[in-house]
């Protein structure tokens, strides 16, 4: 197997904006990724904002104190929200580089790319509404509906994934229909 970036920074409106326009991919020497910690090799253990929910351990007492996972987040952002609430009570997430786990990336949703995109974007908007001020939420909303469709389309056009363009449009159509 290979090491997959599995830790993230807490989302912020500016981080989402930077990722939406692709600054970390265009100028990685200046702009680090806004959310996914792809700029770190994950070879050493350290405290991070958030670890991927596919493989987390915690004391039951902490889980109960925070209030479990928020059910409004389905498949995506549930661990981000949980970790954010953990940090708000002074808790921390720790990434242990010695622990190995096998995770089939997109295993649940690999055959439904449009639906996966819809769920991810929908959960991100719910996270923004829950954790950001109104201006931050509307910044994320604008990025989601106006900037990202364009940058994602251009990125797919200039890649070997042109066949995913219909899924991109279908995912955004689902988001528009279900907002």
Region roles according to the model:
Residues 41-44, 106-110, 132:
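A short, mixed-charge helix-start or loop-turn motif at secondary-structure junctions
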């Amino acid at each position: 197997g290979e090491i997959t970036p599995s830790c993230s920074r807490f989302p912020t409106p500016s981080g989402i904006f930077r990722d939406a326009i692709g600054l970390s991919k265009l100028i990685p020497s200046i702009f680090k990724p806004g959310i996914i910690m792809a700029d770190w090799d994950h070879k050493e253990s350290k405290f991070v904002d958030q670890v991927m929910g596919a493989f987390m351990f915690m004391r039951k007492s902490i889980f109960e104190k925070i209030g479990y996972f928020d059910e409004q987040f389905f498949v995506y952002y549930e661990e981000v929200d949980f970790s954010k609430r953990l940090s708000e009570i002074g808790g921390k997430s720790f990434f242990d580089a010695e622990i190995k786990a096998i995770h089939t990336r997109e295993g649940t949703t690999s055959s439904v790319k449009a639906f996966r995109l819809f769920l991810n974007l929908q959960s991100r908007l719910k996270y923004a509404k829950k954790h950001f001020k109104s201006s931050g939420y509307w910044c994320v909303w604008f990025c989601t509906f106006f900037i990202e469709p364009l940058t994602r389309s251009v990125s797919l056009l200039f890649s070997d994934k042109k066949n995913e363009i219909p899924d991109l449009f279908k995912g955004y159509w689902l988001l528009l229909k279900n907002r």
